[in-house]
């Protein structure tokens, strides 16, 4: 029995990797991560005999976040002294190689995903009807369509090269296909810094939003170009890419207000701006955060931009709807559905006036 098997298994699980047993043959192993559909977790483990005779597991592991492999070294819990100087040097070299192997594997995976996405995009229909878009009250800007009626959003870089796709389905279509309503395809795509631009080349102002429906709403309401970042975690990287591509253009991040969350401990609903740390139901740290606001703030800081949130007329009712029924009203598409495009336009223009941003 490997002396630190249970300890290493615990370290990987604590990092979020879903693993039942450990492969210690020194090869790259991919695995799923808690609360995530994709296999973004990885590890490379080896066996090494210590001076005292015990065989220990050594190596590294991590969770992919964009282009960052998140590499961490297996902690040996004060047993490093049991290795010779030569063993420690060999281990250091092996860990460095593991990180390079992880990076190389990720680049190859992303390249395969980009090729598959580009091929699928070329075969998709130029025109179509989308139940998803109809349910959101928005048009399809630069989209293509699947034979089953799904809307397809390209995920591209500043040169227009496609790196992945987002497939949008109505709830009915998702249930029939046994797939999610929003699906990133294919597995392994590189999202970081990639986006979908609506409305042509920005001249002086560019809006940035998370989801397609939100971005489409903003474009329909204002006529301004809008970029889709797809997730809150991608906002900063997309903002950097856009600022580099369109120098001198102001970037306004139109954030999702993810104030309604669930406690990680008891799964009860709460409002994170009213309970900053502990859950009001179980008293434990809820470990929840307003990802939309945090992501938008980070993006604005990166590019000297600004942020804004949708302002609902009856915000108390919006909050109560989440706490009592789990109904989330978070973005400008929700505002569009409840109060109309004219309200969205008025709020954006008011924010631009407040910032003293105007066309030259």
Model segments located where?
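Short aromatic/hydrophobic-glycine micro-motifs
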Residues: 14-17, 138, 305-306
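Phosphate-handling DNA/RNA-contact segment within nucleic-acid enzymes
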Residues: 109-112, 150-247
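Short, basic/aromatic recognition patches
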Residues: 131-148
């Amino acid at each position: 029995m490997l002396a630190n098997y249970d300890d290493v298994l615990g370290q990987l699980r604590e990092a979020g990797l879903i693993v039942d047993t450990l492969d210690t043959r020194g090869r790259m192993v991919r695995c799923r991560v808690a609360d995530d559909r994709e296999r973004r977790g990885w590890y490379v483990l080896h066996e090494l005999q210590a001076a005292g005779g015990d065989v220990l597991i050594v190596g590294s592991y991590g969770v992919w976040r964009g282009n960052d492999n998140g590499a961490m070294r297996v902690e040996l819990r004060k047993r490093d002294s049991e290795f010779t100087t030569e063993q420690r040097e060999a281990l250091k070299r092996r860990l460095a190689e593991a990180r390079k192997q992880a990076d190389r594997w990720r680049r190859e995976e992303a390249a395969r995903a980009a090729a598959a996405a580009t091929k699928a995009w070329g075969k998709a229909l130029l025109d179509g009807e989308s139940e998803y878009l109809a349910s959101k009250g928005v048009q399809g800007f630069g989209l293509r369509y699947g034979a089953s009626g799904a809307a397809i959003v390209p995920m591209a870089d500043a040169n227009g090269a496609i790196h992945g796709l987002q497939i949008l389905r109505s709830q009915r279509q998702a249930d029939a296909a046994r797939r999610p309503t929003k699906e990133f395809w294919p597995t392994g795509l590189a999202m970081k810094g990639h986006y979908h631009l609506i409305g042509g080349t920005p001249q002086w102002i560019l809006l940035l939003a998370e989801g397609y429906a939100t971005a489409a709403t903003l474009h329909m309401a204002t006529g301004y170009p809008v970029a889709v970042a797809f997730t809150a975690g991608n906002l900063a990287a997309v903002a950097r890419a856009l600022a580099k591509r369109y120098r001198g253009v102001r970037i306004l991040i139109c954030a999702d207000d993810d104030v309604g969350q669930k406690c990680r401990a008891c799964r009860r609903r709460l409002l994170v701006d009213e309970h900053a740390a502990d859950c009001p139901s179980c008293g434990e740290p809820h470990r929840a955060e307003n990802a939309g606001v945090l992501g938008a703030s980070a993006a604005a800081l990166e590019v000297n931009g600004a942020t804004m949130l949708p302002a609902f007329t009856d915000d108390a009712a919006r909050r109560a709807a989440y706490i009592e029924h789990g109904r989330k009203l978070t973005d400008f598409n929700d505002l569009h559905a409840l109060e109309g495009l004219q309200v969205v336009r008025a709020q954006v223009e008011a924010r631009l006036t407040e910032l003293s941003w105007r066309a030259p």
